[in-house]
């Protein structure tokens, strides 16, 4: 594995929102290289564009201008089929809200990406059992979300995001609704999957103590990313 491999690169990314009263430029020129197995935290006050930036990295939103490269290939935003393939094969998303399907069991929620991707049922189950074991969720596989704690529900969301073995995990305030102990458990999972599965992680967080567990910390301020010393 080449840990110097660039997974994604942002070049002069700008994002403007247009309103009847005028326009608001949230991102004013973001430049960032993300390498294989990086652990990156993006911090900053509410409303500065952290989620917008994460969504642009994940191709859930588009920049007003600038270029994004995945695996040294420039993204073409007019090619939705290729963007969808990129998301499915390489990117896992985790949000502050877990978005689990309440009528589904833990096992059914985790296997959903495989079923959507038309995997065989036996392959879906095999993969799900592997992830359940790794995240210590095996005993809860037939539970529905309402029976789980907040931390357990977020662990299921992580398991679902890991199902298709992504290259990159994008996490938007994944511990925002959790107590301190649950937040630590969830953070430990991120660190383990980074180390054991070589998955690159970009996390938006308000929690400075969690941010310090990452290799690189960037402050989003006034539309620009500023790299901070991790001390």
Task: Kindly label every feature range from the protein language model.
Residues 58:
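Helix-to-loop junction immediately C-terminal to a conserved catalytic motif
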Residues 66-77:
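Conserved ABC transporter NBD signature motif
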Residues 104-113:
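Short coil-to-helix segment of the ABC ATPase nucleotide-binding domain corresponding to the Q-loop/switch region
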Residues 144-154:
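Conserved ABC ATPase signature
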Residues 158:
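Hydrophobic anchor residue at the start of the ABC signature
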Residues 163-167:
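A short, proline-enriched helix->beta-strand linker immediately N-terminal to the Walker B motif
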Residues 169-172:
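Catalytic Walker B motif of ABC-type/P-loop ATPase nucleotide-binding domains
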């Amino acid at each position: 594995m080449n840990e110097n491999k660039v997974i994604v690169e942002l070049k002069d990314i700008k994002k403007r929102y247009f309103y009847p009263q005028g326009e608001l430029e949230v991102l004013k020129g973001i430049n960032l290289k993300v390498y294989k197995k990086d652990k990156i935290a993006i911090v900053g006050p509410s409303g500065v564009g952290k989620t917008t930036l994460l969504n642009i990295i994940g191709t859930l939103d588009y920049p007003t201008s600038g270029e994004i490269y995945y695996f040294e290939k420039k993204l073409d935003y007019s090619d939705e089929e290729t963007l969808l393939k990129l998301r499915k094969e390489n990117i896992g998303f985790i949000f502050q809200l877990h978005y689990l399907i309440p009528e589904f069991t833990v096992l059914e929620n985790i296997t959903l990406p495989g079923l959507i991707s038309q995997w065989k049922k036996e392959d879906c189950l095999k993969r799900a059992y592997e992830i359940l074991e790794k995240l210590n969720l095996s005993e809860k596989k037939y539970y529905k979300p309402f029976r789980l704690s907040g931390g357990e529900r977020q662990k299921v969301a992580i398991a679902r995001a890991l199902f298709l073995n992504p290259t990159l995990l994008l996490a938007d305030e994944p511990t925002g609704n959790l107590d301190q102990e649950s937040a630590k458990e969830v953070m430990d999972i991120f660190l383990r999957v980074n180390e054991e599965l070589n998955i690159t992680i970009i996390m938006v967080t308000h929690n400075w103590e969690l941010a310090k567990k990452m290799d690189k910390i960037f402050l989003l301020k006034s539309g620009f990313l500023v790299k901070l010393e991790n001390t």
